[in-house]
Amino acid sequence: MDSNILVKKEESVKVNFVSTLQGKFNNAFAALSERSFRIDGMSGKAYASPNDVKIEIENFRNYKFNATVQRVFDIFIVKLSAILPHKKLETDTEYRRFQTISITLKEYMTLCNLKNKTKAIDQLRNALNIIGRIHVDFMDTIYTNKKKVEKNFCYFQIADNIARDKGKGLYYISFNIEFLRHLANSYVMPFPLQAFRIDLNRYPIAYQLCRRLTLHHNMNYFKGNANSISVKSLIDSVSLLPTHQEILKGAGQVSLRIIKPLEKVLDFLVESGILTDWHYNQQFSKKTYEQWIDSAIVFTFVDFPKRKNYNATSNDESKKVTPNIG
């Protein structure tokens, strides 16, 4: 399809949004892929440092890091977002009330439109085993007694425990108190429910791409560029795509390995009812990589929730979108 022409969605498709949290760790974690990590041959630990967030994962080679792991993590954060008070908690005792989040196998399968029970179980097991082995280290802003302060979230494991109740079909994450403190001071972000239903085997980069577009739109909602993102920013957030330098060193065409896959996924996001349309901000007489990388993508979400312009210290819970994940 000629992507200079607006791609239109079918009017019958309906999209709902849920609330999630766009914390510094969450945003960094969402942009990773297996190729983002450096693996220590002796310890088996994997290391990555996206956006000044140091991430360490134990026994990395024993599990498979992919978009499914990020999707499972985001689903737990959506469930946490539904109950975690925003910028209101102070003590560890207060945070412990919201520490453990669970999801049923049936809920996960319904949410992600999965039919194969065995594959769904494997996805949850693999994802939770990775999430339970993540250590992080980063600086971030929190609010203490309604005052904005910089806090060093110094090397800790994000989950105190992961568990499975096989009889009840339940999967649990007990988040670390420090991680909850970070999340409770993060910004709330609407997220398209349809994104969880993306077929990650057919469209492995679609989830990362959708999340990046959502983050950009939400962060710039009250600015003039909420519906426009540079191609460079977009592909930098999709670590599964090869880089221009990698293609120049090896075989293959830039158009076939970077440009076309990106356009195909943007078309898919329209067809699946997440976006209304997308197009480039300019016409290309000849689409060279240099022209393409300097261009921008203009996009429109289907029924993105309207927001009010709260100031940074607002504690108003009404800024949350009503969660609806079953």
Model-assigned labels for residue ranges:
Residues 1-326:
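Charged, alpha-helix-forming regions
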